[in-house]
């Protein structure tokens, strides 16, 4: 263990207090950064298995892909014209003197360069996680989410997704009801509720 490991763990815990930047324009309850990272990591794991990538590396990159946001915040497309963030500096300071410092630096550089399958998978997962959240928000009537889904996200599928699996997932997300996973359950409670024994 390194001298700053516990401080690092407290800092990443603070990501649950960091809302996603688009809270400003979306009316539904948006995720915090921790929630975004968790589901992005699960998506990345699925893609990594399908694409036969290095799962260990994919999961590590995914866990830290937005780590700078604990210090640099999250910004949306609207803010990019007005705000300069120093993400590399934030990443360096976050991992400084931790046991993960060297490996995290290498993985974050790999992610930024997008040259490896693993880095591309994580970027696909990052984008697909946005599509899942927009679909959920649209389902509860957020008109801004509906607009973003129709006007902007098809371009992401065509121009920003790297993997075949990522593109197939995007297509499936568009066709899937966010509530379908629990509405078709066949467990004992659901059967009893429907009158089955």
Task: Give the predicted meaning of each segment.
Residues 1-197:
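Alpha-helical, largely C-terminal catalytic domains
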